[in-house]
Amino acid sequence: MVFGTLYTFPGDQCRTIAIKAVAKANGLDLDIRETPRTPDHLSISKLGKVPAFQGADSFKLFECMAIALYITSQNEQTTLLGKDKKEYAEIIKWMSFFNTEIVILMTQQLLPQLGVIPYDRDQVEFFANMTQRSVDVVEEYLQDRTFLVGDQLSLADLFCAGNISLGFQFFYGKAWRQQNPNVSRWYEMVCHQPIYAAVTDKFQLLDEPKLTNNPPEKKPETVPKNGAAVAIEATQA
């Protein structure tokens, strides 16, 4: 029986990965709709943002964190929400941090280079530096830690790895990873977890960045569908 309908874009949409991963692990069958902004979708999210969710019982949710927490909580024995209230609060803390202080800034670095919004070299550089400031916080935090919260995998790891996958898809080549070994180690660890790998494309790392702060070569309408969709929607939920 279908548990609910999830509205998203095709491919590894950065704010949807954790939702898909936890749903699959919990045995919850989701009807994945990859053509957003249909009337049904807009009845849930008036702004047409993804992800959006409607349960088989007609319960509606938008905002990625809310959906991820709701899907995870369907398993009352889950270990993904922490061992106690403090760990639960930390999980939400890191989800919020990545969702606001990394993804939003990173997409302002990304969208101009994809030709989705006007390109300005100084603005791209500004947002790249702002993103790195936030990533530096995580890099320092992970110096002597394997997981973001506690001593086992949590929803924070799944959700935040999905968020920062944009960086590893477009920007984070070998040189960057050498300069940010803790974040890189953590990201690779999460990507190889069966729960995460089961719903994502084959894991690959860049040797060189795909984008290095240059004007887009293609017009917006010819930007690869998946890359543009991932980038645009990363700013919207």
UniProtKB/Swiss-Prot annotation:
State where composition is biased (Basic and acidic residues).
208-222
Q: Which Pfam families has this protein been placed in?
A: GST_C (PF00043), GST_N (PF02798)
Q: What induces it?
A: Expression is induced under hypoxic conditions.
Q: Which residues form the GST N-terminal domain?
A: 2-79
Record GO cellular component, one term: nucleus
**Which stretches does the entry tag as region Disordered?**
208-237
Q: Which family does it belong to?
A: Belongs to the GST superfamily.
Stretches assigned to the GST C-terminal domain: 84-222
Knockout or disruption consequences:
Abolishes the production of pseurotin but leads to the accumulation of deepoxy-synerazol.
Give GO terms: molecular function aspect only: transferase activity
- Which positions in this protein are listed as binding glutathione? 37, 49-50, 63-64, 99
Q: Which organism is it from?
A: Aspergillus fumigatus (strain ATCC MYA-4609 / CBS 101355 / FGSC A1100 / Af293)
Binding residue positions for substrate: 49, 108
Cofactor names from the entry are: glutathione
InterPro entries under this entry? EF-GSTs, Glutathione-S-Trfase_C-like, Glutathione-S-Trfase_C_sf, Glutathione_S-Trfase, Glutathione_S-Trfase_N, GST_C, Thioredoxin-like_sf
Q: Show the disulfide pairing.
A: none
Ordered alphabetically, the record's keywords are: Transferase
Q: What does this protein do?
A: Glutathione S-transferase; part of the gene cluster that mediates the biosynthesis of pseurotin A, a competitive inhibitor of chitin synthase and an inducer of nerve-cell proliferation. The PKS-NRPS hybrid synthetase psoA is responsible for the biosynthesis of azaspirene, one of the first intermediates having the 1-oxa-7-azaspiro[4,4]-non-2-ene-4,6-dione core of pseurotin, via condensation of one acetyl-CoA, 4 malonyl-CoA, and a L-phenylalanine molecule.
| Gene3D superfamilies, per database record | 1.20.1050.10, Glutaredoxin (3.40.30.10)
Please identify the protein, giving its name as recorded.
Answer: Glutathione S-transferase psoE
Q: According to the UniProt entry, what is the EC number of this protein?
A: 2.5.1.-
Pathway connected to this protein = Secondary metabolite biosynthesis
